[in-house]
Amino acid sequence: MGEKTVEKSFLYLLPEKHTAEELAQVLTDAGFDKKKVEIWKEINLLELTLNGSVYVEDFEESLRKEDEDTLSGLGMQQVYSVTYPAEEAKSVKEIMQKWMASFDGKLGSDTEDFAPFLTIEEL
């Protein structure tokens, strides 16, 4: 039997609203293969095909009023859930470095207050 892939995830909190298309553009501008990028505009989801798939999904539908208040207090306006196979951690770190350089933001946990916050190296 094949080994089960270990999935990892975190939340990417942004200080301004950006679409999945804008996130993808930063990567393709940096040389990421456009054939490995798929965008579902209607649900604001980005799939990056590496050895496994990295999903970057708008988390807005999952936010409660309290979450929105917490985000506002942190100076953040948008949240994406990022899910990826553990073996893609190096690639995800590189992707996050590009996005953080372009959009800033924080890397959070799926908890009530989004803490603990993570560094790119901890992914």
Which residues are covered by each model-predicted region?
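Short, intrinsically disordered low-complexity segments
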Residues: E16-E87
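Acidic, proline/glycine-rich low-complexity IDRs
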Residues: M1-S9, L14, H18-K35, T83, ...
